[in-house]
Amino acid sequence: MDDTLFQLKFTAKQLEKLAKKAEKDSKAEQAKVKKALQQKNVECARVYAENAIRKKNEGVNWLRMASRVDAVASKVQTAVTMKGVTKNMAQVTKALDKALSAMDLQKVSAVMDRFEQQVQNLDVHTSVMEDSVSSATTLTTPQEQVDSLIVQIAEENGLEVLDQLSQLPEGASAVGESSVRSQEDQLSRRLAALRN
C-alpha cells in the first residue's frame, strides 16, 4: 500500500512537470505570435496562436490529471491510516474477549475504556482524512479566493474580467464556507471530547 502511495505521489509530480512544460511552451508560442505580428506575417501568427492555445489546453489537462491523481493519493493515505487504526481496534477486541472470558470486571472496564478511546480516535482520524481529501479536490476550493486571484492577475495585466465574474451564480462561495465551518466546529467538539 505504501508503494502505491509513493507511485501515486510520484505520478502527480510528473504530471505537474508536464503541465509546467506545456505552459512554458505556450508562452514561447505566444512570443512567436508577437514576433510574427511585428513582421506583418498574420498567417504564421495564426499558426503560432493555435499552437499556443493547444499547449495551454494541454497544460490545463495535465494539471487536472495531476489534481485527480493527488486526490487518489490522499484516499490511499486514508486507507493506510485506517488500516493501522483497524489493527489497533482488533487488538483491543481480543483483549476484551480475554477479559470477558476471565470475567475480571476491572480488566473488562479497562479494556472497554481503551476500546472507546480507539473508537473516538477513529472518528477523529476519519473526519480529518475526509477533510483533507475534500480539500485536495478542486471542487472545494473557496470561490471567493479563486475570484480574488483572477481579479488580482487581471489588474496586474490590465485585463477586464469583473463583468464575467459578476455573472457567476450568487452564493457560490457561501455554501463552501459554511460547509467548512461546520466541519471545523464538529472536529473541534470531538477534539475537546478526546481531551476530557
Curated annotation (Swiss-Prot):
Residues 5-42, 102-124 form a coiled coil. Highly expressed in adult heart, kidney and liver. Expressed at lower levels in adult colon, spleen, lung, brain, testis and muscle. Also expressed in myoblasts and embryo fibroblasts. One of its GO terms (biological process) is ubiquitin-dependent protein catabolic process via the multivesicular body sorting pathway. The modification Phosphoserine is found at residues 101, 173. Keywords: Acetylation, Cell cycle, Cell division, Coiled coil, Cytoplasm, Endosome, Membrane, Nucleus, Phosphoprotein, Protein transport, Repressor, Transcription, Transcription regulation, Transport. It holds the Pfam family Snf7. It is found in: Cytoplasm; Endosome membrane; Nucleus matrix. A motif (MIT-interacting motif) lies at residues 185-195. One of its GO terms (molecular function) is protein domain specific binding. It is a peripheral membrane protein. InterPro entries: Snf7_fam. Its main location: cytoplasm. GO terms for cellular component: amphisome membrane; autophagosome membrane; condensed nuclear chromosome; early endosome; endomembrane system; kinetochore; kinetochore microtubule; lysosomal membrane. The modification N-acetylmethionine is found at residue 1. It comes from the Eukaryota. Belongs to the SNF7 family. Probable peripherally associated component of the endosomal sorting required for transport complex III (ESCRT-III) which is involved in multivesicular bodies (MVBs) formation and sorting of endosomal cargo proteins into MVBs. MVBs contain intraluminal vesicles (ILVs) that are generated by invagination and scission from the limiting membrane of the endosome and mostly are delivered to lysosomes enabling degradation of membrane proteins, such as stimulated growth factor receptors, lysosomal enzymes and lipids. PANTHER family: CHARGED MULTIVESICULAR BODY PROTEIN. Probable peripherally associated component of the endosomal sorting required for transport complex III (ESCRT-III). ESCRT-III components are thought to multimerize to form a flat lattice on the perimeter membrane of the endosome. Several assembly forms of ESCRT-III may exist that interact and act sequentially. Self-associates. Interacts with CHMP1B. Interacts with VPS4A. Interacts with VPS4B. Interacts with PHF1. Interacts with IST1. Interacts with MITD1. This is Charged multivesicular body protein 1a.
